[in-house]
A protein has these predicted regions:
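Bacterial N-terminal signal peptides that target proteins for export
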Residues: 1-10
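A composition/secondary-structure signal for short, hydrophobic, low-basic-content segments
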Residues: 3, 17-19, 30, 213
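Bacterial N-terminal signal peptides
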Residues: 9-19
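Lipid deacylating catalytic domains
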Residues: 24-233
Length: 233
């Protein structure tokens, strides 16, 4: 995992951007973060949409994080953090604007929130888009500290009221924050209940807008690529 010296500042991070992106439009670099046990390819539709709009490969970052065979082992602390941290720092360093946009799906939403707040990067993020995230917790994980036998539902996990979730609540993530959600999301709306504390769990504190679609958990990612691209331009 990279350790970024805070005194160094981020003003010089895009020194090589012009050389790297000479053939591309000057737009924010984009970081796309998949969900628990997912793959970077989960964002293929988004990637294709961005490419069609003129983004270069060097402007799109798709880190791969976490165990692919043990979803219950993944949380928001430790080895899961490194790939996302590296992608954020590398994206800022290579962005011709000095800023980035980020899009997360499912647990990728909360993992992005963790890294942005932990590293103090919110000032470098223009747009944060959270798709089908459990920003307020998953009822399938129960209420902390109960039903926390797995890492995914533990202290650093997604049980409702977990110390981790309480720690990111209300923290600034970007200049503009949006959520994309569904009332038929089979993961976030476990047992038919989507709300936590009277608010849809995918809604993010301070969001500029929230967009609702009649898709399932993965359909929200796969079938909203144009909406995602619109939000970051």
């Amino acid at each position: 995992m990279k350790v970024w010296p805070r005194h160094f500042g981020y003003a010089v991070l895009f020194v090589f951007a012009c050389a790297v992106q000479a053939q591309a439009a000057c737009v924010d670099s984009v970081v796309l973060v998949h969900g628990n046990a997912g793959q970077p390819s989960d964002f293929d539709a988004t990637y294709a949409e961005l490419k069609a709009r003129g983004y270069a490969d060097a402007q799109i970052f798709r880190p791969s994080w976490g165990s692919k065979i043990c979803p219950a082992c993944n949380d928001h602390s430790g080895s899961e953090e490194g790939p996302v941290e590296d992608a954020l720092i590398d994206a800022i360093a290579s962005s011709c604007t000095g800023h980035i946009d980020v899009i997360g799906h499912s647990m990728g939403v909360t993992l992005l929130a963790r890294e942005i707040t932990r590293l103090g990067l919110s000032g470098y993020v223009d747009t944060f888009v959270g798709i089908a995230g459990a920003y307020r917790g998953l009822w399938s994980c129960g209420t902390y500290p109960f039903n926390v036998a797995t890492s995914t539902c533990g202290y650093w996990g997604l049980s409702v009221g977990s110390p981790f979730l309480n720690g990111i609540r209300g923290k600034p993530l970007a200049a503009r924050t949006y959520s994309i959600k569904s009332w038929i999301d089979e993961i976030v709306c476990f047992g038919g209940v989507c709300m936590v504390g009277g608010v849809h769990s995918s809604s993010i504190d301070g969001e500029a807008a929230s967009y609702t679609y009649a898709y399932g958990h993965f359909g929200l990612l796969w079938y909203t690529a144009a909406q995602q691209a619109d939000l970051i331009r």
